[in-house]
Amino acid sequence: MTDANEPFHAHIYYEAFDRSTAQQLHSELQAKKGTGDLVDVIFVGVMTDRAVGPHPIPQYEVHFYGKALPTVLERIKANRLRALVHRLTNDDLADHTSQALWIGEPLPLDLSVLDPAGMNQAIARFGNSDF
């Protein structure tokens, strides 16, 4: 069961062939965050057209509360994009591996760059910034 106020991240991936679809979803999320069925989406990061952090291909990050999980998943699936969705806890490794939900084909992440357990810096950035 998901806690309605629990923080989540979605990493929405794209490649050259589906960048325009990713851009359309990005624009929609950015324009509608904090309103309607996206009221619990609080941050949409920049589209990063290169590998960054543990992510091997371009992506952008969406921050939201658990209440928005069904809506966020529905939007990603409807656009046929690949994504990694996870709770935001103090265990960055588990968040990105054993506790993660993949939509589409999983990608090999660079786990060596994740924060040590108990020191997840993404918690302080939640709702404010991505990398």
Describe these PLM feature segments.
Residues M1-F131:
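Long, contiguous binding/interaction regions
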